[in-house]
């Protein structure tokens, strides 16, 4: 069992049990298991559980440089035309205000309002998706801060013998936000556009495989394909959760919604690549710093980015043709090569058990450190 704590709070616990990888963080987590193999590619199911709700995703395995990585893979694809519509401009800009987004009055919006401003109008769907993606990451950042504050209060109450019943969850406290520049937003938008163009091609391949599977070319195996996080064309990454990185030999924190630009393509001996901090919030790594970030963390940023694009396309499919947004030519869906798995309904119990084991382990370590002679040889 590996237990790590972020510089700004929050705990992540990882273990492997009976072939399943169990990851807990904050008040949720996921359980990953081997799922199916298609054309030499290994796919895995991830069952996420938080707040009493399950959702499941497909992840493709990539063996590269002696490490395994897992990349998000859509279980259902739209027809190619919808992706093409997504990365081409609309005939005229579309106004889509805060009321249309439904963000007005939301605590996270008030907290981050000075750091990020949505576009006043949208020239293309991929700009709309860019604001959707950023909003999802900032909502996650706000929730993570609230959870970390609540967990810290609970730990302090436990240490002092107080039940903590009167405190409740503490909201994050704003601390001088820094603006997300138009240049950084444009870099994110261009990554979204490139992803949609790639997905248009992939969606066409899904249809071709359905029509004539015998004619499909032999795919690359998991052991000779680098993960998407190391794709030379993929440079801009939006941080998905709290991450500890190293700048000039010193650790610093990145939080959900921060933006980094990958500078190097080849991991070092510690499985790190270099990245530049493009946009950050008060208390995180300074903007402009070069940091060493683990490829595993970079891949998870990519995964959340790709999943949010998929979710955002679902929102576009619902909203196209309404509120002044042009209608899309085709929002039909088609099955992918790998069917979506069923949720692992044992995940909640596995995550709870792991959290309890981590609590016990940390409690034991503290007791040993506090005992006479604790920590000495």
Region locations from a protein language model:
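Low-complexity segments
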Residues: 2-176
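Short, surface-exposed beta-strand/loop "edge" segments at domain boundaries and coil↔beta transitions
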Residues: 21-23, 42-43, 246, 281-286
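SH3-family beta-barrel domains
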Residues: 177-243, 265-267, 271, 287-289, ...
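Short, surface-exposed secondary-structure edge patches
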Residues: 227-228, 248-254
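Conserved beta-strand/loop element in small beta-rich adapter and peptidoglycan-binding domains
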Residues: 251-265
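C-terminal assembly and membrane-engagement modules of membrane-active proteins
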Residues: 256-259, 274, 329
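SH3/SH3-like beta-barrel fold
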Residues: 271-280
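Mid-chain, structured segments of secreted extracytoplasmic proteins
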Residues: 283-295
């Amino acid at each position: 069992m590996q237990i790590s704590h972020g510089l700004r709070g929050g705990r992540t616990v990882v273990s492997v049990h009976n072939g399943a990888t169990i990851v807990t963080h904050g008040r949720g987590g996921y359980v990953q298991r081997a799922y199916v193999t298609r054309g030499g590619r290994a796919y895995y199911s991830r069952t996420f559980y938080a707040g009493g709700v399950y959702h499941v995703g497909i992840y493709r395995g990539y063996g590269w440089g002696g490490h395994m990585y897992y990349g998000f893979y859509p279980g259902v694809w739209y027809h190619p035309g919808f992706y093409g519509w997504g990365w081409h401009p609309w005939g005229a800009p579309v106004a889509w205000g805060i009321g249309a987004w439904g963000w007005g009055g939301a605590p996270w919006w008030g907290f981050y309002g000075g750091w990020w401003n949505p576009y006043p109008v949208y020239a293309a769907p991929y700009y709309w998706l860019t604001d959707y993606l950023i909003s999802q990451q900032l909502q996650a950042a706000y929730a993570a801060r609230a959870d970390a504050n609540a967990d810290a209060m609970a730990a302090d109450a436990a240490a002092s013998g107080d039940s903590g019943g009167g405190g409740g969850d503490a909201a994050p406290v704003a601390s001088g936000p820094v603006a997300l520049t138009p240049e950084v937003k444009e870099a994110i938008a261009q990554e979204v556009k490139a992803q949609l163009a790639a997905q248009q091609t992939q969606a066409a391949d899904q249809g071709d495989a359905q029509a004539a599977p015998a004619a499909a070319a032999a795919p690359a195996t998991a052991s000779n394909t680098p993960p998407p996080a190391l794709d030379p064309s993929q440079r801009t990454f939006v941080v998905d959760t709290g991450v500890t990185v190293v700048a000039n030999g010193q650790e610093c924190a990145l939080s959900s919604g921060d933006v980094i630009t990958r500078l190097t393509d080849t991991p070092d001996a510690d499985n790190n690549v270099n990245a530049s901090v493009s946009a950050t919030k008060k208390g995180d790594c300074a903007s402009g710093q070069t940091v060493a970030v683990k490829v595993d963390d970079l891949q998870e940023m990519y995964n959340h980015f790709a999943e949010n694009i998929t979710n955002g396309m679902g929102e576009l499919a619902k909203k196209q043709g309404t509120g002044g947004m042009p209608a899309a030519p085709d929002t039909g869906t088609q099955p992918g090569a790998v069917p979506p798995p069923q949720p692992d309904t044992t995940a909640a119990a596995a995550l709870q058990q792991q959290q309890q084991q981590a609590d016990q382990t940390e409690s034991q370590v503290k007791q040993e450190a506090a005992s006479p002679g604790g920590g000495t040889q």
